[in-house]
Regions:
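Generic alpha-helical secondary structure signal
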Residues: 62-64, 160, 166-168, 295, ...
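Positively charged N-terminal leader segments that act as targeting/secretion signals
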Residues: 288-319
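Hydrophobic alpha-helical membrane context
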Residues: 25-27, 212, 308, 313
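Residue-level recognition of conserved structural "scaffold" positions that shape functional pockets
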Residues: 23, 124, 206, 305, ...
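C-terminal cap/substrate-recognition subdomain and adjoining C-terminal extension
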Residues: 86-112, 116-291
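Alpha-helical substrate-recognition element adjacent to the catalytic core
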Residues: 2-143
Length: 320
């Protein structure tokens, strides 16, 4: 009987991990006539005022704003918005190259998205076919094809559910009973030790912690402009000055001064305290999304996701 090759699973956040900013910022929000700060300000304020999950708040705001402006919010429209996504250099080529590298080592490489963004927008990004499964927020569509209800919400510790699904090979989100049934470790499709998680924001920390606890690997992605990050720090919230900049962002990617959002009852929520945390405390390493050191020359001139000297894979990262 033929023995199946070991499976190595790459698990990715999407926004600011594979692409340069929140996916809604490229085309969806401009189609409403808003700036990203204006839209996220509205969505975040609505969530604060109603003590609402932040992702459900932004999905509700999407439905309401499109209805107010007579924009048909259907799957085709959101797929079209995904065509404007700007991926980091090398991302499109990454999948074929790492797959080939894995094959040369006798392992099967699989890719999964676990994102607080929208599945429908990711489907239009041009790389959706690279993923075995995409776990992201998703709408339910009525008989007219209009988005009318959140079908799936992927947020913070909820993200860990999908790590377990990949671990057990139970990818269908409607199969709750099987997911919670006991399963011997030797029957699990992808061991935690064969998982590599990449993410950049607050919503990724629980999955990073899982990787650390169960023997997988986690890589914290940061921008080159975040000087503190380059020295090994992983910062919350907003990754401090030099990160994403000021103004409201989607929940899970809070900016440095996100404390101006109104809280329930009209009160201002307290200003966040800048908490330093080493990436290794959250389960892994720090990966620069813009430059990697060339091992031979030491020059910082190689874009991320494309540093493959010969047949050796160099995901250049450093532990705290």
């Amino acid at each position: 009987m033929e023995t199946q090759a070991p499976i190595i699973a790459f698990l990715y956040d999407f926004d600011k991990t594979l692409c340069t900013t929140d996916m809604e910022d490229y085309a969806f929000i401009p189609s409403l006539g808003y700036t990203p700060a204006e839209f996220w300000g509205r969505a975040n304020a609505f969530g604060w005022e109603n003590r609402m999950d932040g992702l459900l708040a932004y999905m509700y705001t999407m439905i309401q704003e499109c209805a107010a402006q007579n924009i048909k919010l259907d799957r085709a429209f959101l797929n079209h918005c995904g065509e404007s996504i700007q991926l980091f250099p090398g991302v499109r080529e990454w999948f074929a190259r790492i797959n080939a590298f894995g094959e040369s080592l006798g392992v099967q490489v699989e890719h999964y998205v676990i994102s607080s963004g929208l599945r429908e927008i990711i489907e239009g990004s041009g790389i959706a076919q690279e993923f075995r499964e995409i776990y992201a927020c998703e709408f339910y569509y009525n008989e007219n094809g209009d988005a009318c209800w959140p079908k799936l919400d992927v947020n913070f510790t909820n993200k860990t559910q999908f790590v377990y699904r990949i671990n057990k090979g139970i990818l269908d989100v409607s199969r709750d009973k099987e997911l919670n049934d006991s399963m011997p470790d030797d029957s699990k499709r992808v061991p935690f030790t064969n998982m590599i998680y990449m993410g950049d924001g607050l919503s990724d920390v629980p999955c990073m912690k899982m990787m650390r606890v169960y023997g997988g690997q986690a890589i914290a992605v940061y921008q080159a402009s975040n000087r503190q990050g380059r020295t090994g720090g992983f910062h919350f919230p907003g990754r401090l000055p030099g990160g994403h900049g000021a103004g409201p962002h989607r929940p899970g990617h809070p900016p440095e001064n996100d404390h101006h959002r109104p809280a329930a009852g009209g009160q201002q929520p307290p200003a966040p305290q800048h908490r330093r945390r080493c990436a290794s405390q959250s389960g892994g390493a720090v990966l620069n999304t813009e430059y990697l050191n060339d091992r031979k020359t030491g020059a910082e001139n190689a874009p991320v996701f494309s540093v493959f000297p010969g047949k050796s894979l160099y995901l250049q990262y450093r532990f705290c």
